[in-house]
Amino acid sequence: MTETKPIRILGVGNVLCTDDGLGPYAIKVLEAQFEFPEQVEVLDLGTPGLDFTPYLADTRMVIVLDTVKGEEAAGTLRLLRDGEIVAKPPPSRMSPHEPGLREALMATEFSDSNPEEILLIGVVPESTGQGTKLTEAVRSAVPSVVAAVMAELERLGCVPVRRDPPAELDLWWE
């Protein structure tokens, strides 16, 4: 019997830096609203840096939730797939957690353990200064982040069950 590779949803960010806490916040929303199939792992990684690699290795799909640099208005949703993430020139940082995702993906490719698919669901931040709450622009984008995650899981045939009623949102840092 072959083992099914996991699908991982990874929230990345620093909850003490306003909008940079998007990833952990979105993970808490997902956990409160849905029960996930066994092969789907939902994890708040905080700011993993190069420790990202083990979470990417040998997976069917990795969905990363994070803030991303962009010229668009704060709160704009950006989706980057597979090669788009490593295609950026090295000096251009896509998130405040680099070195991190880009370098970790390159490491998994080198060791031939890279994820079959990866999707970065990012939101352009308004502020990454000190603070424990998301700005209104980024908080308003969270339902779109959740919808993008659900669309990917549905495409993969791993549909979570909606909690009725949802669990209480555990935002321990607010």
Locate predicted features.
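A short glycine/serine-rich beta->alpha loop
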Residues: G11-L16, P90-R93, Q130-K133
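General N-terminal leader/first-domain-start detector
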Residues: M1-T2, E174
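Nucleotide and nucleotide-moiety/phosphate-recognizing core
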Residues: E3-L10, V15-A87
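Phosphate-binding/catalytic loops
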Residues: P89, L101-E174
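Conserved active-site and cofactor/substrate-binding residues in soluble primary-metabolism enzymes
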Residues: G21, Y25, T47, E72, ...
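Helix-loop-strand module that forms the ligand-binding subsite of alpha/beta enzymes
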Residues: V68-I118
